[in-house]
């Protein structure tokens, strides 16, 4: 029997077979192999007469992320806001680069649009070839479009704490009843209300993963991207790659760099080029043999 792991907690794996949710343990061979089933994994399982199961095989993964530990994500939805707590564009760029590196589609969701539509963020990212949608859990703005983008796909939601992930998911599917947290007036950030990764089935045939806070996407995970690969994680760079004077151009300080020339002409936003440079420096700190 095949199914998808929708939750992993205290050594138990909850597998959705399409007909039922079966509570499973993992076979001992995974421990011996040093591998672990992840939320999102497609697995083969054996079911006992008492209705419990055991995970026998992990089917090939499309992708997987280290932190948060989740596999087979089709779409990464990054929630941002132009109001308290304001999202740093560098964090958006870091997550979008990770998504691209893992062959995962990326969607920027500017939430709390009823308070601030985030015109600058919308301008930067729509011009960069990144899909953007404005949403509000209060007014319902953008929810139909967001729901359409999630249909039939496994999607991970992330964003800095307090940006409204749980509230937005509740607005999309009220039956989820996810715990929400108010934004601290003193700290300017929200309390973490998501403690573990879990996939929630939607009526449109998709799944959403409400993942723990933004700190999960740490520098260690970014360093799995080698410096030479990073340029392919910025879609607006693509028309200019191969047009630099040097074939191994890093687009940082080499002469006759087509990417920097495009930025000078306003075809690439300065903040995106700056983020690329910062991420390149992070990736360059770890040598190839250390990855």
Name what the model sees in each region:
Residues 1-9:
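Structural detector for short beta-strands of small beta-barrel domains
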Residues 11-15:
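Short aromatic-glycine-enriched beta-strand elements
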Residues 21-37:
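Beta-strand/loop nucleic-acid-binding surfaces
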Residues 34-49, 59-76, 81, 97-106, ...:
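Helix-rich effector regions associated with P-loop NTPase G domains
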Residues 50-58, 86-88:
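Short, Lys/Arg- and Gly-enriched loop/turn segments at beta-strand edges
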Residues 83-129:
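Phosphate-binding glycine-rich loops and their immediate beta-loop-alpha structural context
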Residues 112-163:
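Canonical P-loop GTPase G-domain recognition
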Residues 165-181:
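A conserved segment at the C-terminal end of the G1
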């Amino acid at each position: 029997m095949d199914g998808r792991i929708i939750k992993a907690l205290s050594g138990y794996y909850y597998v959705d077979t399409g007909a039922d949710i079966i509570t499973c343990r993992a076979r001992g061979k995974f421990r011996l192999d040093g591998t672990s089933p992840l939320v999102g994994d497609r697995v083969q399982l054996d079911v006992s007469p008492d209705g419990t199961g055991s995970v026998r095989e992990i089917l090939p993964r499309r992708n997987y992320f280290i932190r948060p530990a989740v596999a087979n994500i089709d779409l990464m939805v990054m929630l941002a806001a132009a109001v308290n707590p304001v999202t740093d564009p560098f964090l958006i760029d870091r997550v979008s680069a990770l998504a691209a590196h893992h062959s995962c589609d990326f969607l920027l969701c500017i939430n709390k649009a009823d308070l601030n539509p985030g015109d600058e963020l919308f301008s930067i990212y729509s011009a960069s070839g990144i899909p953007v949608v404005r949403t509000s859990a209060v007014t319902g703005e953008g929810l139909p479009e967001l729901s359409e983008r999630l249909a039939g796909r496994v999607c991970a939601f992330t964003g800095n704490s307090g940006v409204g992930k749980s509230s937005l998911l509740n607005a999309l599917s009220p039956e989820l009843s996810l715990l929400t947290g108010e934004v601290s007036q003193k700290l300017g950030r929200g309390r973490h209300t998501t403690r573990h990764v879990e996939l929630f089935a939607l009526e449109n045939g998709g799944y959403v993963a409400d993942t723990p806070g933004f700190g999960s996407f740490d520098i260690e995970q970014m360093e799995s991207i080698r410096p030479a690969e990073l340029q392919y994680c910025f879609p607006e760079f693509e028309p200019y790659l191969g047009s630099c004077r040097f074939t191994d151009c890093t687009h940082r300080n080499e002469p006759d760099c087509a990417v920097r020339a495009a930025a000078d002409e306003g075809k690439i936003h300065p903040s995106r080029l700056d983020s690329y440079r910062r991420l390149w420096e992070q990736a360059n700190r770890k040598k190839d043999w250390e990855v």
